[in-house]
């Protein structure tokens, strides 16, 4: 099997996101690379499902909270930008301040 560099990068994101998802499910707080991979993979899948850029920008802010990540991680991730493949082409999805405090 031959994968292009872009396909290799996407595969690496999916593997890292899977690890992050399993850790999150076990109650282990995510570090910086895990949090970015988790958010990125969800955005990529949403794009493949046909969701809109605007919808994914909002969705990206609901995936993780301060309780899901290690101390200091939210301050390190001010934005996540994902070049995602939509049914009508490739578009850039920017999620600003993706990790937010849980609402009461």
Curated annotation (Swiss-Prot):
Q: Write down the EC number.
A: 3.5.1.5
Stored CDD domains: Urease_gamma (cd00390)
Q: Cellular location of this protein?
A: Cytoplasm
Q: Which GO terms describe its molecular function?
A: nickel cation binding; urease activity
InterPro entries registered for this protein in UniProt: Urease_gamma, Urease_gamma/gamma-beta_su, Urease_gamma_sf, Urease_subunit
The protein's annotated catalytic reaction(s) are: urea + 2 H2O + H(+) = hydrogencarbonate + 2 NH4(+)
Gene Ontology BP terms: urea catabolic process
Q: Name one Pfam family in it.
A: Urease_gamma
Alphabetically sorted, this entry's keywords are: Cytoplasm, Hydrolase
User: Membrane spanning segments where?
Assistant: none
What EC class is this? hydrolase
Q: What is its main location?
A: cytoplasm
* Pathway the protein takes part in: Nitrogen metabolism; urea degradation; CO(2) and NH(3) from urea (urease route): step 1/1
GO CC entries: cytoplasm
Q: Which family does it belong to?
A: Belongs to the urease gamma subunit family.
| NCBIfam families in alphabetical order | PRK13241.1, urease_gam
Q: How does it assemble?
A: Heterotrimer of UreA (gamma), UreB (beta) and UreC (alpha) subunits. Three heterotrimers associate to form the active enzyme.
PANTHER family, A to Z:
UREASE
Report what the protein is called: Urease subunit gamma
The record's gene field reads ureA
């Amino acid at each position: 099997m031959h994968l292009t560099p872009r396909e290799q990068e996407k595969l690496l994101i999916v593997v890292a996101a899977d690890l992050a998802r399993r850790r999150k499910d076990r109650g282990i707080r995510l570090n910086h690379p895990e949090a970015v991979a988790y958010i990125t993979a969800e955005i990529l899948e949403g794009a493949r499902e046909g969701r809109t850029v605007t919808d994914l920008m909002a969705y990206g802010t609901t995936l993780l909270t301060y309780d899901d990540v290690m101390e200091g991680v939210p301050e390190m991730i001010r934005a996540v930008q994902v070049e995602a493949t939509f049914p009508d082409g490739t578009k850039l999805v920017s999620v600003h301040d993706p990790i937010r405090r849980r609402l009461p």
